[in-house]
Structure formats: structure tokens, C-alpha cells
């Protein structure tokens, strides 16, 4: 029986995809994948969804039923508890829009708060094995780069995340993990060339009941260098001042707020934020969310 099931596995997988509304055809990609079955586009499916879809296909096979007709059962699996990455960043399926998952996280493009001065890394490479009458560089090129101070912003709709994960503990752990990843992660492109392994000068985390609020407009006027005061430090102070303006003029008082600052206390943040280390911030955030769910 297991041998027969193994031989039918690919066909069953194809029928499951058909029940979900996805078209499967022979791949025209070059290499070893050419001719193998593939969907028209990439589909983000969580491991727990794969397991449940496989169980459904096996049960249908054992009962002699056609899993390709089990559209309701397949849809229920896609609408069940989501994996944290899908719950955070969403999933769009053009052929099956009813299976789409709205993202509970939003991540803004980082932008420079100061004036950028492009610089260029000029490099040459010489062929050590070239003949004596073939002098000169084998390669000459430049790589553009800049060293800017960035403002980064992201927000998570915790209620929406809880609805998709359907688990209080997973929601709390997911939010805390997202905060740490957002703070510490850096783009990996060109890291060997520029070693851009930096951590933020300042991190502000707020819990709000009303709406997410970005302070991007604090830097509409670029930060300019001053003697003895770094751009990043000026940016931190301006960020706090803008948040204070929002609190005073819009009445947007956060439920809880923390900040991490490597350059010492920030006067404009001390009025409404608790200064902590990142580990303490994560622990306090975790305790606050757990208390909210247990209330």
C-alpha cells in the first residue's frame, strides 16, 4: 500500500493544487528542473499547511476519493492558523484570491536623514599570468556607495497577527522576535565589500491602541552637521521632539513606550519613554503583552 501511495504522490500533489485553484504544468526552466511539474508562479505555503494538505491527500487516497474535488477542505487548511512569517508579511495568490492573507506588518523604506554625498571605490585587477607584452590592467571599474544615517520604521497590527496565528503565546513571541529582527537585521548585499555591520543609535518602540504613527516627517528638513554633535544624535533628538509634538497636538499618548540609545539619555524622549537596554525592552514588551492577553 505504501509503495502504491509513494508512486501516486506526485499526482496527488497535483490534485491538491488543482483543488486550491493553482495551475500545474511542466516547467520550462533550464537545468535539472526542466520538465518537472511546477505552478505558474511561486506560492508561499507554510510547513504546517503542507503537512495538513498531505494528510488530506492521503486520507482521500485511502478512502478512494478524488482530492481535487475537496475545495472546501483545502480552503479550510489555507484559512487555518498561519505560520508567523505569512501572518506578518502576507500572501497574495493571483489565481486564488480567496486564499490571500493580509499582512499584519508594514515596513517602510529606509531613507537618509542627512545629505548624501556619493563616493566611488575605484579598483583595478591585474592578470599575474599575462605575457610581458600584454601590460596593463585586466579590469578597471568603480563601485558607488554612500555613508548615510537612516531612519527606519515598521509597525505590527498585533490584533490582526493574533487573529491569524490564533494563539496568544505565538503572537507575543512573534512580536518580540519581529522587534529584535528589525533592530538587528541589515541588508546582506555587498556586505563583503562594505562590512555594513552596524546597530542603530536609537530604537523607539511604542504600543498604541489608536493607530500606527511614523515620525518620517521629522526629517523633511535634512539634518545638517554641527561641530561636536553627530548627525545621528541630532536625528535622535529631532525624532523625540516630533513624537512630543504629536502627543501634545493630537493627543496620541502611547500605552507603553521604551527606547534604547547608545549615546546616552535623550531629553526629548525621557518625557514619555522608558530608557532600557534591548534585552530589557524585549522582556518588558513580552510581559506587557502577556498581561494584556491574560486580563
Each language-model region and where it sits:
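Basic polyanion-binding and macromolecular-assembly surfaces
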Residues: 1-295
Amino acid at each position: 500500500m505504501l509503495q502504491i501511495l509513494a508512486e501516486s504522490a506526485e499526482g496527488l500533489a497535483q490534485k491538491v493544487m488543482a483543488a486550491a485553484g493553482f495551475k500545474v504544468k511542466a516547467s520550462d526552466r533550464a537545468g535539472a528542473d526542466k520538465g518537472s511539474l511546477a505552478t505558474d508562479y511561486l506560492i508561499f505555503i507554510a510547513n504546517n499547511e503542507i503537512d495538513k494538505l498531505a494528510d488530506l491527500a492521503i486520507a482521500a487516497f485511502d478512502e478512494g476519493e478524488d482530492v481535487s474535488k475537496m475545495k472546501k477542505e483545502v480552503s479550510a487548511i489555507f484559512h487555518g492558523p498561519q505560520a508567523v512569517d505569512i501572518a506578518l508579511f502576507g500572501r497574495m495568490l493571483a489565481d486564488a484570491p480567496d486564499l490571500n492573507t493580509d499582512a499584519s506588518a508594514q515596513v517602510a523604506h529606509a531613507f537618509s536623514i542627512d545629505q548624501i554625498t556619493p563616493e566611488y571605490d575605484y579598483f583595478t585587477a591585474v592578470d599575474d599570468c599575462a605575457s610581458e607584452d600584454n601590460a596593463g590592467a585586466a579590469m578597471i571599474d568603480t563601485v558607488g556607495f554612500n555613508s548615510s544615517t537612516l531612519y527606519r520604521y515598521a509597525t505590527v497590527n498585533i490584533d490582526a497577527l493574533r487573529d491569524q496565528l490564533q494563539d496568544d503565546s505565538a503572537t507575543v513571541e512573534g512580536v518580540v522576535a519581529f522587534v529584535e529582527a528589525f533592530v538587528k537585521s541589515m541588508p546582506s548585499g555587498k556586505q563583503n565589500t562594505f562590512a555594513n555591520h552596524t546597530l542603530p543609535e536609537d530604537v523607539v518602540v511604542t504600543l498604541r491602541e489608536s493607530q500606527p504613527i511614523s515620525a518620517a516627517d521629522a526629517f523633511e528638513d535634512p539634518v545638517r552637521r554641527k561641530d561636536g554633535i553627530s548627525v545621528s544624535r541630532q536625528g535622535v533628538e529631532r525624532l523625540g521632539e516630533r513624537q512630543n509634538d504629536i502627543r501634545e497636538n493630537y493627543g496620541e499618548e502611547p500605552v507603553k513606550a521604551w527606547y534604547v540609545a547608545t549615546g546616552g539619555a535623550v531629553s526629548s524622549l525621557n518625557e514619555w519613554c522608558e530608557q532600557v537596554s534591548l534585552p530589557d525592552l524585549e522582556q518588558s514588551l513580552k510581559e506587557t503583552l502577556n498581561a494584556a492577553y491574560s486580563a
